Amino acid sequence: VTETRKYRSPSREQAKADTREKIVQAVVRVVLDDGLHAFTVQNVALKAGVSHRTVYRHFTTRDELLDGLAESLDRIAAGSTVPTTPETIDDVIVTVAPSFQAMGEVRDAVRAYVITSLALNWQDDNRRKRTLAFDKAIGAAFPQLPSKERREATALIRHLASTRAWYALTVEGGLDDAAAARAADWAVRTLFKDLGRRDRAAAKARS
């Protein structure tokens, strides 16, 4: 008796996801290999080895291509054991160093993301949500701080925990991923310690 083996093709949804990721990786290669000036839907299609129509089915504009890159990085971050959107300052503290190490594992994608977001003055929705989460966590931890000081601290700490800080410390500063992670971790902890001191002083002054 001859056994009939059934060939199971990938599901349609998985095939779509694979194509989408292939296109996203093509964005990375276009930006890093050919330059930001070459970042067009057509060039991404050529780099991915797919038709312009195929790209258009997934992403209709450059901004949507960048959203796709951001979503790809978010999926990687979601697979880690640290919180991606902090609820407390402890979440921020435990996130910084592991996040920097994770960025180093997908450094080309992070480099492309930072280059394009800065050059095009663009940021994705999740980045904005994380910024608001940082502000809420810091405000809850240091309720006596004047709003001006809190905003300044939030902006700096948010930057230190970002892809842009990783880029500045590694690509521009020449640190390896481990050293960059230590530097950012130290800076965030130092700032929180100082904010605690200032918050206590403000509370005492008001009592």
Name each region found by the language model.
Residues V31, F59, E64-L73, V114, ...:
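Alpha-helical DNA-contacting segments of helix-turn-helix folds
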Residues G49-F59:
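Short hydrophobic/aromatic patch on the recognition helix
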Residues T154-L175, T190-R200:
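Amphipathic C-terminal alpha-helical segment
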Residues D91-V94, P98, A102, L118-A155, ...:
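Amphipathic alpha-helical packing segments from all-alpha helical-bundle domains
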Residues V1-G49, E64:
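Basic, helix-initiating cap at the start of DNA-binding domains
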Residues G68-L73, P98-N121, L132-K136, Y167-A168:
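Amphipathic alpha-helical segments used for helix-helix packing
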Residues R29-D33, A38-F39, D67-T95:
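Amphipathic alpha-helical linker/stalk segments
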